[in-house]
């Protein structure tokens, strides 16, 4: 886990860290070459602080992990998926402002 509390999620740890999580998980699908992904990164970092203890936040590099994005039909990045109880409960595709993401997350956390 990174210093900012954000998990690095891979195809191999996805089931354990995301699907079996007791708390909701926001998973950010990104790539190093993706400009909008880089623009979204500081927002995801801020959300990790704002929602600390209420949900987990993870990032998955789509260039290093192909199975999970294919499984969830992630065709454009950045894509944010919110998982709760092992199911996708929210999907946000493309760059979104912090307020829009926070509103979506509030629907799924205690």
Language model: regions and residue ranges:
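Proteins that catalyze or organize thiol-disulfide redox chemistry
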Residues: 1-26, 31-56, 64-110
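Conserved residues in the N-terminal Rossmann fold of short-chain dehydrogenase/reductase
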Residues: 59
């Amino acid at each position: 886990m990174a210093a900012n509390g954000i998990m690095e999620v891979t195809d191999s740890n996805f089931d354990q860290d995301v699907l079996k999580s007791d708390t909701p998980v926001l998973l950010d699908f990104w790539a190093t070459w993706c400009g909008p992904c880089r623009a979204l990164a500081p927002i995801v970092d801020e959300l990790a602080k704002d929602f600390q203890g209420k949900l987990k936040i993870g990032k998955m590099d789509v260039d290093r992990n192909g199975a999970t994005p294919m499984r969830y039909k992630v065709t454009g990045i950045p894509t944010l998926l919110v998982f709760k109880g092992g199911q996708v409960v929210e999907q946000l595709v493309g760059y979104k402002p912090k307020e829009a993401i926070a509103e979506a997350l509030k629907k799924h956390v205690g």
